[in-house]
């Protein structure tokens, strides 16, 4: 075994020497020779830029980038300040609009109520303590006509502004619209759980209940044994 290994090693050495001789006969430097390493090192050094130019170029690039970033920061700061000013102006304008809406929101309603007040004033002028007995009948007729006109005007004003009167006789009891006063026995033709009597009318404004109707609700009467 040792002889075979020795023989194989000799063959390898002989082949390597023959290969080296043929390589040098052609004038080519050996791949692992000192000349080859020197030439490769010189080629690498010739391609590298001088070390003296590296730091100044990097520093200059950083300065340019810093100036650019500083300009961007200044621009963003100006935009941010303008946005804050615009938001503040919008907030003040909105607040002013809300205050005006609170003050003048019922302006139209008040204007219509003034006409109702005029009718009421003219009606009261018809009543005088110094009126003669024979004129009392005529005065009462005028007052009655004035009250009818006043009621009609109020209904017109309420309808114009979305104010709806609730008179829920016969309707099913609804705690969101009705205030229960008491229960009463259900009479003929009256269903239990429905409104039998309205003590005070309720009102809705644009579909929202602003005053509950005070009602009496019918219940099934108990049979006596």
From Swiss-Prot:
Keyword Nuclease part of the UniProt annotation: no
Highest rank taxon of the organism: Eukaryota
Single GO cellular component term: TIM23 mitochondrial import inner membrane translocase complex
Alphabetical GO biological process terms: intracellular protein transport; protein folding; protein import into mitochondrial matrix
Stretch forming the transit peptide: 1-32
Keyword terms: Acetylation, Chaperone, Mitochondrion, Transit peptide
Protein family (similarity comment): Belongs to the GrpE family.
Positions of transmembrane segments: none
Localization (cell): Mitochondrion matrix
Entry's Gene Ontology molecular function annotations: adenyl-nucleotide exchange factor activity; protein homodimerization activity; protein-folding chaperone binding; unfolded protein binding
Pfam short name (any one): GrpE
Subunit structure of this chain's protein: Probable component of the PAM complex at least composed of a mitochondrial HSP70 protein, GRPEL1 or GRPEL2, TIMM44, TIMM16/PAM16 and TIMM14/DNAJC19.
Protein function: Essential component of the PAM complex, a complex required for the translocation of transit peptide-containing proteins from the inner membrane into the mitochondrial matrix in an ATP-dependent manner. Seems to control the nucleotide-dependent binding of mitochondrial HSP70 to substrate proteins. Stimulates ATPase activity of mt-HSP70. May also serve to modulate the interconversion of oligomeric (inactive) and monomeric (active) forms of mt-HSP70.
Protein's name according to its UniProt entry: GrpE protein homolog 2, mitochondrial
PANTHER family assigned: GRPE PROTEIN, GRPE PROTEIN HOMOLOG 2, MITOCHONDRIAL
InterPro entries referenced in this protein's UniProt entry, alphabetically: GrpE (IPR000740), GrpE_coiled_coil (IPR013805), GrpE_head (IPR009012)
